Structures are given as structure tokens and as C-alpha cells.
From Swiss-Prot:
It is an enzyme of class 3 (hydrolase). Keywords: Cytoplasm, Hydrolase, RNA-binding, tRNA-binding. This is Peptidyl-tRNA hydrolase. Pfam families: Pept_tRNA_hydro (PF01195). One of its GO terms (molecular function) is tRNA binding. Its main location: cytoplasm. The record marks N9 as: Discriminates between blocked and unblocked aminoacyl-tRNA. The record marks D87 as: Stabilizes the basic form of H active site to accept a proton. Disulfide bonds: none annotated. Belongs to the PTH family. The lineage of its organism: Bacteria, Bacillati, Mycoplasmatota, Mycoplasmoidales, Metamycoplasmataceae. The active site is at H19 (proton acceptor). GO terms for biological process: protein quality control for misfolded or incompletely synthesized proteins; rescue of stalled ribosome. Hydrolyzes ribosome-free peptidyl-tRNAs (with 1 or more amino acids incorporated), which drop off the ribosome during protein synthesis, or as a result of ribosome stalling. Catalyzes the release of premature peptidyl moieties from peptidyl-tRNA molecules trapped in stalled 50S ribosomal subunits, and thus maintains levels of free tRNAs and 50S ribosomes.
Length: 184
């Protein structure tokens, strides 16, 4: 069973911030699949299908690993079937990257997931948000109007890639993503 987790911070205060692009991708993915996040735990919300789970932690970003660990243990999911979607300041707005391993790159939600899963071998779809002067203030602010079209396009493409991934292998998904990379 595949587990796809979109990272973000809970609450209306953070809903439109750069740090919540993982939530945005999951929301669009669920909408495209006509699904709703109808299951809830203390640490998050999710929707379970026979072959996959879409999940959003409702803890703050730096505690995202608690919910991921909870779902992995309860549903006996192998970390090889886990994919995390999150914001990355190392990529420009409008860029995205799929990785199979690596450090958290300063992203605290991903760092907590790596800590809880005890491995860096976690698939991830990183959504570029560019870099600001003060990282904390920057990620907790909305995109500039000039970036709205780019971020909307990359969120759409990310959701489409995940739809493809749900019924294909990760390798096939990477090949398709890389073939279309210049379009994102």
C-alpha cells in the first residue's frame, strides 16, 4: 500500500502560506480522485483506498513524523512505499523535483519524518518556493501575486504525477516526470 503525505501547518492562519504547498497538492489530488479526507486521528486526517492512503498531518510541521509513524505502524506500510510532498527553498517557484533519498535540506517536517522512520530512504516530491531572507518569515507568508500562476501550474503537475504514481512504479513515474520536466 502506498502512503502519500502532504506537509503543511494546520489552521486558517497558515492555509495560504508557502509552507503549505504539500497540503495544496494533496487537496488537489483528492479532488481529482473525488475523495475526501474522511478519517481522523489525533495527529492528522487521511483517506484510505484499497491500494493507497492520502494523508495530511494536523500537527505543526516540525511534528509531522508522529502522524507518518502512526500510519506506517497501524497499516504496516513499508517506508519504501512512503512519499512525502513538501516545500523546498532550494528550488525556484515553479520547479519541482522527485527524489528517492537524501537529507531534509533544512525542512523540519521532513527532518522529523526521517527521524521517526529511521531512514533517509524516503521518496519525496519537493515543490520549489524559492528562498527568502528570513526563512521562518518567508515560509509562513503567501506567494507574491507574480508567482501565483507558476505555483498553480506546478501544483497541478504534481497532482497529475501523483495520479500516475498511484497506478505505476516509482521508476516509471520518475521517467515520466523527467520527460516532462521542462514543462513544469
Amino acid at each position: 500500500m502506498k502512503l502519500i503525505v502532504g506537509l503543511g501547518n494546520p489552521g486558517e492562519k497558515y492555509a495560504k502560506t508557502k509552507h503549505n504547498v504539500g497540503y495544496w497538492v494533496l487537496d488537489l489530488l483528492a479532488e481529482k480522485l473525488a475523495l475526501s479526507f474522511d478519517q481522523k486521528t489525533e495527529n492528522g486526517i487521511y483517506v484510505k483506498q484499497p491500494d493507497f492512503i492520502l494523508a495530511k498531518p494536523t500537527t505543526f510541521m516540525n511534528k509531522s513524523g508522529d502522524f507518518v509513524e502512526e500510519l506506517i505502524k497501524f497499516y504496516k506500510i513499508n517506508t519504501q512505499d512512503l512519499m512525502i510532498i513538501y516545500d523546498d527553498m532550494n528550488f525556484e517557484v515553479g520547479q519541482a523535483a522527485i527524489k528517492t533519498t537524501g537529507s531534509a535540506g533544512g525542512q523540519r517536517g521532513m527532518a522529523h519524518i526521517i527521524e521517526k522512520c529511521k531512514t533517509k530512504e524516503i521518496k519525496r516530491l519537493k515543490i520549489g518556493i524559492s528562498r527568502g531572507k528570513n526563512a521562518k518569515e518567508y515560509v509562513l507568508s503567501p506567494f507574491l501575486p507574480k508567482d501565483n500562476a507558476k505555483i498553480k501550474l506546478v501544483i497541478e503537475e504534481a497532482a497529475n504525477i501523483l495520479i500516475f504514481y498511484l497506478s505505476n512504479s516509482f521508476i516509471t513515474t520518475i521517467e515520466k516526470f523527467n520527460a516532462n520536466k521542462n514543462k513544469v
